[in-house]
């Protein structure tokens, strides 16, 4: 007896569901695209338990006839394609006929639909791929489809779903994408507890951006519009002896068309921790294409730090024959016929828009100095050589080194510049004040590294390099300490201890700070609201997706409170793991410490440097900051002796 057999249709549908239905957001995506293909002008999405318990989508599209409603749940049944040639120019969002049968095979489905020409509608109920009921009913024009108990018959798939807030944030992000792409439509997203998004139709995309992100984000966006002619490329003609007839010798000339790009890109002042705010559509289709992502990365190179991302809303439009959307089960990846042309066009168009707007990145700013903190580090007549442990000409030193003195002032909201510099040979004069980069976002990897054996408590601070790095000495050699990340480690462990003892220090705001959250951030906030409160944030609802911050952790400047809260929510929004309380506490503490810590380009007195080194020595892990960056560099006496050729 043979070993190979044909799978039953029921099993085949479950396998297909594994490709199409990855999570609740995948179901929402397929159903929304069906509604858009049906010409809907109003779409309402309601979910419960992050979509695990219920996904209910209602639209006012053209609806379906009774026979079509039944046929729609058959595999590869579609109204979008008829001939093989149609695959070469797909103009609809759906076309395979896989989504509905795949969803119905792993969930309980109730479909209510009525076409405009029909006096009554059709109600269809399916569970696990089996039709339970079909009947006529009086229904409004359009379609309503409810998906209950997703993966109820495949527990192995269900256990791999993330927390309710994580799944809800994915759904919120998806609906936000389509709401931005279709400002002419009415969109609603509701969870079991509140409304995450209500966006009435508007005339322009900028008005829709205002609805979703608020006026502050809109003011930081740059409009973009560009177009380019496509090149005429194709397969070479066959030689004359292989042509079927002489009439085919001259091929009909067809204009290749144009590629058009329009939308909005953000100035460098807006910096996100993840790519969730990058919205790219190709012919109205939401994509996550590596080619376009790389083009955007190249366009923002040397403008944004490599670990941070812009806000982007871009629409690529081109002939349907120039893009293949049938390359991935979820249809989020595409293949362009002229990849290099599309990549360079996107990159150069974004660069040109940034250059035309002449934005001044927030992390490049000047230091307005008073008298310098240390006479020995004041500008001199000679240019400072690069730092090296190689023998050089002996610099002219003052008779006596002094540290301390008056401090300089930094503007309250002056951001951190990005400028390369060479460190000094110890004791040389500094020719001019230069600035040092500081990471303006936080990468939330929290390694648990062992504490170093170095006797940090015995360090004696000598001064600062660029008012950003503390130079210290001990019997073991020369030490360089990054003052920002050192203080960050001190504050991180302090916040965790205060949280454990329920004695977190807070600061009451004179006036509540009004913060508007995105739908995805609001979904995360619902999950971690109590933990935020335990860490010093006092936040109350103040309308739809708007919250009033009345108190915040002590040490965070007033102008940084909104950014701190936003970074916390964004970091959880990109989280792929189930919610873990201990991990959440560490993540929130790390973000608070990052924003409350001493900054670079900040002068410190001798007492402050001694205090910081003493506090760092008391921490459990003094060698790395909470995000994994090194805190200290050490040059041993032996290394220095080797550099001077003494051993």
From Swiss-Prot:
Name the domain of life this protein comes from.
Bacteria
What GO MF annotations does this protein's record show? Answer: ATP binding; ATP hydrolysis activity; ATP-dependent DNA damage sensor activity; mismatched DNA binding
Pfam families with a match to the protein in the record:
DNA_mis_repair, HATPase_c_3, MutL_C
What does the entry list under GO cellular component? Answer: mismatch repair complex
Which keywords does this chain's UniProt record carry?
DNA damage, DNA repair
Any GO BP annotation? mismatch repair
Family classification:
Belongs to the DNA mismatch repair MutL/HexB family.
| Functional description taken from the UniProt entry | This protein is involved in the repair of mismatches in DNA. It is required for dam-dependent methyl-directed DNA mismatch repair. May act as a 'molecular matchmaker', a protein that promotes the formation of a stable complex between two or more DNA-binding proteins in an ATP-dependent manner without itself being part of a final effector complex.
Q: Do you know which PANTHER family this protein is assigned to?
A: DNA MISMATCH REPAIR PROTEIN MLH, PMS, MUTL (PTHR10073), DNA MISMATCH REPAIR PROTEIN MLH1 (PTHR10073:SF12)
Name the UniProt record assigns to this protein = DNA mismatch repair protein MutL
Q: Which organism is it from?
A: Koribacter versatilis (strain Ellin345)
């Amino acid at each position: 007896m043979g070993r190979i057999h044909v799978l039953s249709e029921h099993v085949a549908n479950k396998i297909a569901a594994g490709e199409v239905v990855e999570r609740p957001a995948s179901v929402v995506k397929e159903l929304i695209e069906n509604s858009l293909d049906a010409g809907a002008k109003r779409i309402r999405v309601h979910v419960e338990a992050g979509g695990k318990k219920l996904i209910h989508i209602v639209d006012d599209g053209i609806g379906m006839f009774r026979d079509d409603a039944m046929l729609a749940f058959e595999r590869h049944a579609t109204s979008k394609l008829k001939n093989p040639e149609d695959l070469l120019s797909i103009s609809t969002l759906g076309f395979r006929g896989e989504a509905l049968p795949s969803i119905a095979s792993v969930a309980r489905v109730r479909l209510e639909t009525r076409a405009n020409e029909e006096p009554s509608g059709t109600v269809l109920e399916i569970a696990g791929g089996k039709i339970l009921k079909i009947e006529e009913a009086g229904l409004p024009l359009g379609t309503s489809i409810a998906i209950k108990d997703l993966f109820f018959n495949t527990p192995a798939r269900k256990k791999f779903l993330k927390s309710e807030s994580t799944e809800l944030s994915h759904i919120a992000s998806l609906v936000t994408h389509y709401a931005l792409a279709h400002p002419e439509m009415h969109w609603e997203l509701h969870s079991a507890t509140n409304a995450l998004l209500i966006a009435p139709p508007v005339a322009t995309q900028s008005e829709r951006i205002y609805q979703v992100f608020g006026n502050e984000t809109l003011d930081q966006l740059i409009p973009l519009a560009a177009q380019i002619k496509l090149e005429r490329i194709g397969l070479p003609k066959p030689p004359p002896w292989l042509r079927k007839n002489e009439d085919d010798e001259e091929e009909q000339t067809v204009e290749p068309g144009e590629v058009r790009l329009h939308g909005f890109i953000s100035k460098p002042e807006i910096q996100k921790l993840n790519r969730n705010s990058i919205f790219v559509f190709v012919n109205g289709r939401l994509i996550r294409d590596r080619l376009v992502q790389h083009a955007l990365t190249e366009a923002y190179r040397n403008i944004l730090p490599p670990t941070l991302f812009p806000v982007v809303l871009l629409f690529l439009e081109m002939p349907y024959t120039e893009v293949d959307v049938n390359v991935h089960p979820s249809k989020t990846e595409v293949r362009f016929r002229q990849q290099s042309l599309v990549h360079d066009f996107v990159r150069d168009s974004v660069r040109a828009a940034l250059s035309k707007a002449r934005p001044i990145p927030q992390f490049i700013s000047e230091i307005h100095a008073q008298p310098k903190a240390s006479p020995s580090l004041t500008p001199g007549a000679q240019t400072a050589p690069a730092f090296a442990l190689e023998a050089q000409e002996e610099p002219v030193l003052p008779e006596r080194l002094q540290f301390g003195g008056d401090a300089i002032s930094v503007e309250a909201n002056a951001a951190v510049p990005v400028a390369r510099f060479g460190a000094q040979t110890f004791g040389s004069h500094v020719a001019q004040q230069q600035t040092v980069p500081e990471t303006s976002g936080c990468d939330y990897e929290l390694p648990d590294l062992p504490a170093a054996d170095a006797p940090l408590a015995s360090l004696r601070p000598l001064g600062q390099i660029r008012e950003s790095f503390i130079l210290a000495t001990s019997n073991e050699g020369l030490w360089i300490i990054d003052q920002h990340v050192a203080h960050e480690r001190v504050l991180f462990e302090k916040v965790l201890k205060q949280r454990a003892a329920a004695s977190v220090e807070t600061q009451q705001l004179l006036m509540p700070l009004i913060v508007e959250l995105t739908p995805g951030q609001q979904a995360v906030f619902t999950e971690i609201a109590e933990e935020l409160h335990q860490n010093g944030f006092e936040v109350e609802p103040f309308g739809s997706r708007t919250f009033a911050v009345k108190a915040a952790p002590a040490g965070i400047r007033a102008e940084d409170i909104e950014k701190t809260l936003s970074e916390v929510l964004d970091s959880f929004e990109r989280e792929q793991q189930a919610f873990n309380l201990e991990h959440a506490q560490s993540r929130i503490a790390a973000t608070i410490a990052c924003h409350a810590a001493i900054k670079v380009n900040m002068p410190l007195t001798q007492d402050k440097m001694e205090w910081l080194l003493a506090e760092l020595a008391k921490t459990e892990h003094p060698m790395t900051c909470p995000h994994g960056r090194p805190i200290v560099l050490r040059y041993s006496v032996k290394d220095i002796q080797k550099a001077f050729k003494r051993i």
